[in-house]
Amino acid sequence: VRTPFCKAGTTFKGFSAQKLGSLVIRELLDRSSIDGDLVDEVVLGCVANPVEAANVSRVAALMAGLPENTRAYTVSRNCASGFESVTSAYEKIMTGFDDVVIAGGTESMTNIPLIFNEHMTTLFSKLMKSQTAFQKMKTVLSFRPHYLKPIVGVVCGLSDPVCGLNM
């Protein structure tokens, strides 16, 4: 079971990675007639884990109605994330550690955040540390418009930090 591919910012723009993952998990369980209580673990790959769901697999599993005692973890290996989750599940089943594992991937490229640059985060930090009205005013007045230029999370996350190539 999978969701269809679509361009970022279009059909699924209102769906978070955890929501997309939970929909697929729920549909898989419904189609297969597997009781959720039998699922030992959920392993999902996700390139850009949402900040509000750091372990997106766990959140998706719970949103899909799996019991709280179901183990879940997220794999983050850029383009290999989903494949790694499947091979990890396979290994656990083959070694007898688990009997039923749900594995796959989830992603919402639309919802990868824009990030404040170093100038802006430094300004926020100084503002939080300012104790007097004068210190706060001095910090605010040091603001420059270029501080608002964001770092595009999806571009940053999909570029190799060593060689700069797009992954």
Residue locations for each model-derived region?
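Short polar catalytic/cofactor-binding loops
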Residues: 1-4
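Acyl-thioester C-C bond-transforming condensing/cleaving domain
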Residues: 7-36, 53-54, 61-167
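Short glycine-rich phosphate-binding loop at a beta-alpha junction
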Residues: 38-45
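Glycine-rich phosphate-binding loops at beta-strand->alpha-helix junctions
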Residues: 46-52
